[in-house]
Amino acid sequence: MSYIAIVDYGAGNLMSVHNTLDYLGYENKIAASADVIENAAGVILPGVGAFPDAMAALEHSGLTEAVLKAAKEKPFLGICLGMQMMVIEFGRNVLGYSDANSVEMDNKTAHNVIDLMEDQKNITNMGGTM
């Protein structure tokens, strides 16, 4: 039976995504190993926190290669920081902007691939990207 893999790298709200997919009737598995990601019909990359910490957690989990491969080959959804990680990775490795980043994380880079919404630029106590 096919399922959706929810990537468990220590920086995402896994149970919220898992419970939502269960409620909607989608088979899903928490993926803490590459084989669960590789055998999935689709992949969700949730994320919370700061980009450098999340990327370090993903690398430490040993799932980076499986996640990158899945993003190229399967339906793939990044949620919150997970989506930002995907866009920044695209900016760095496809567009060739080695300093690609989100303006929230590095407002000095010449290549902000994720910007703040105009009406939220003065809000400092919450995320307001895109």
Question: What function would you assign to each model-found segment?
Answer:
Residues 1-130:
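N-terminal beta1-alpha1 cap of cysteine-dependent amidohydrolase-like domains
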